């Protein structure tokens, strides 16, 4: 998978470059940002041609991975709608492995048989008490990517469990490093973005700097890129603990993408907070992000 991944990455980059030069991949939408300053595409409905992308990716014999954590009875209640909707809308027509991280044995919901989909239920060790959910999540994720996920899939997404897919989440989202734009902060002035502003924290971004504010609900890319994020996150958290500082997962995520620019950004359509009114820029909500008491 490692050698295959490198070849796939090179061919993907070449193909997308050709599409860009041919003005096929990115269509114009004047009401939203469709390309970043570092030339990464921002994916909105109407900015891509799925038929062209499908024609390419169906020839690549690729496997997608989707990881979700449901490690308590509280989170477990959201798992059924997540899996039911993901099995319908996440990468339809492609091989998908769902990695479901739980803290106890779990019976999967009844779903229609799909020979392209498989499920791995991975029990999180309870040998130690985790006081920080995100620290646990990234530690466990890093372990499983190293041990087996990187050999099993070509692209990997990690998502929050309190999400419901409403439209196709397809191959237009694939890239080396994928970040999700925050549904609220995308429509706000960059001077107000809630980065970590304390210089003592490893998540620190100085005033006047920063590109976008990214949501922690979705991160994706090729496995080694997701693994790199988990390593950098854990390194930053440990450094802050040693210095007596405490920041948040989302702020560490934003610092990572500030230093390591994502190669593709997903518009707020791919993680829309259901408590917000839908603006005219959002044509279709691909994935609805619900508060943890609304499902």
List the predicted regions and their residue ranges.
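N-terminal anchoring/stem segment of glycosyltransferases
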Residues: 2-133, 144-151, 294
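Structural signal for hydrophobic/aromatic residues that build the beta-strand cores
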Residues: 66, 86, 98, 141, ...
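Short coil/turn segments at secondary-structure boundaries
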Residues: 79-83, 111-115, 135-136, 169-172, ...
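Short, polar loop motifs at secondary-structure junctions
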Residues: 101-107, 162-163, 270-271
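A conserved donor-nucleotide-binding helix/loop in the catalytic core
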Residues: 125-158, 246-257
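GT-A fold catalytic core of metal-dependent nucleotide-sugar glycosyltransferases
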Residues: 138-189
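Acidic, glycine-rich loop-and-strand cores that form catalytic or ligand-binding grooves
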Residues: 169, 180-193, 216-232
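Catalytic core and acceptor-binding pocket of nucleotide-sugar-dependent glycosyltransferases
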Residues: 201-292
């Amino acid at each position: 998978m490692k050698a295959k991944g490198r070849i796939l990455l090179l061919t993907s980059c070449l193909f997308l470059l050709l599409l860009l030069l041919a003005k096929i991949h990115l269509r114009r939408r004047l009401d939203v940002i469709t390309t970043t300053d570092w030339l990464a595409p921002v994916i909105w409905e109407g900015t891509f041609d799925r038929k062209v992308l499908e024609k390419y990716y169906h020839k690549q014999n690729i496997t997608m991975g989707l990881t979700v954590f449901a490690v308590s009875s509280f989170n477990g209640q959201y798992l059924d709608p997540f899996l039911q909707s993901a099995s319908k809308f996440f990468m339809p027509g492609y091989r998908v492995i769902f990695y479901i991280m739980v803290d106890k044995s779990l019976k999967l919901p009844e779903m229609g048989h799909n020979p392209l989909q498989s499920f791995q239920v991975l029990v999180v060790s309870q040998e130690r008490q985790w006081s920080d959910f995100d620290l646990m999540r990234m530690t466990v994720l890093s372990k499983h990517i190293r041990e087996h996920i990187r050999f099993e899939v070509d692209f990997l997404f990690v998502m929050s469990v309190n999400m419901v897919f409403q439209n196709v989440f397809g191959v237009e989202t694939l890239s080396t490093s994928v970040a999700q734009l925050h549904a609220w902060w995308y429509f706000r002035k960059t001077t107000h973005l809630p980065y970590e502003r304390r210089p003592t924290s490893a998540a620190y971004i100085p005033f006047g700097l920063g590109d976008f504010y990214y949501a922690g609900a979705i991160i994706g890319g090729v496995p080694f890129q997701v693994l790199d994020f988990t390593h950098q996150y854990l390194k930053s958290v440990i450094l802050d603990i040693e210095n007596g500082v405490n920041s948040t997962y989302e702020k560490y995520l934003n610092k990572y993408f500030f230093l390591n620019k994502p190669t593709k950004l997903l518009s707020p359509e791919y993680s829309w907070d259901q408590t917000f009114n839908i603006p005219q820029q959002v044509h279709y909500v691909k994935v609805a992000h619900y508060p943890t008491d609304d499902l």
